[in-house]
Amino acid sequence: AIYEVSGENFNVLSPKQLGVVLFEKLGLPAGRKTKSGYSTDAEVLENLVSAHPVVPLVLQYRAFTKLKSTYVDGLLKLSDENGFIHTTLNQTVTVTGRISSAEPNLQNIPVRTELGRVMRKVFVPRDGEHLLVDADYSQIELRVLAHMADEKNMIDAFLKGEDIHARTAAEVYGVPLDEVTPQMRSSAKAVNFGIVYGISDFGLAKNIGVSRKEAREFIEKYFARYPRIKEYMDSCVRQGHEQGYVTTLFGRRRNLPELSSSNYQTRSFGERAAMNTPIQGTAADIIKIAMVRVADALRREGLEAKL
């Protein structure tokens, strides 16, 4: 279909050949040009989706190719003679203490797209007598943040079972909860999660498609509505500078030598780490404790189940 629509026979996965076809043969408006030719990365192509019918086909082809190479071919290589896949779960590879998965990474199986969800169907129980069960905490990092910062507005929203992103949008935009639009909620969601990761106005602006000034104002409004969160974040950075480390709620430390760097970017990274490590690390601690308790309960009850 790509060859028919473009009128050219070429290697779709070659950025150089694709650039020539799109920008020279078809005359589409060229974006950035690199030393090796025209840039054909996802951002450039997304901006050209409506310019020519071949562009969405190329994006779709790339998505299919990635899914096949990473998940179909990749998982087949790692499955044993009985069709089982055994991942490696790492306890202490990530700096925040989150569990990570490798060979294959089973924490990264796609779910956002329809085709990605099909990939999940390859994981099935060993027989008709067994089930695969999964469980997850709802908004655990934001709940941890609300607790550690003792932010009453956010705690109140969680205790009432409200949609935290809609509640944040209502707080920041100054509108009743039932007047929050999907766009408002989407922006508030980006800020809620961004705060956990120490997002900057530049990063937020890019995420939600607004100017840097608007993003800065949004963050300022957020902290005005949730003042204890700002105080808590500042106290984490102070602790990092004074002690050289920050801790989770359970006392697990992360050393932050970056905070004493003379390089501004390195120091800024250290400050973001000081803000997000106690939150992400505490959430990781809670999940690990829960996993141990579940495993103990399964053994104690003599259930034919594995965690």
Question: What label would you give each PLM region?
Answer:
Residues 1-9, 149-159, 302:
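Mixed-charge, glycine-rich, non-catalytic linkers/tails in nucleic-acid processing enzymes
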Residues 22, 109, 144-145, 169, ...:
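Buried hydrophobic packing segments
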Residues 110-122, 127, 288, 292-300:
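Conserved alpha/beta core surface patches that mediate binding of polyanionic ligands
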Residues 111-116, 160-167, 259-263:
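Flexible glycine/proline-rich, aromatic-decorated loop/lid segments
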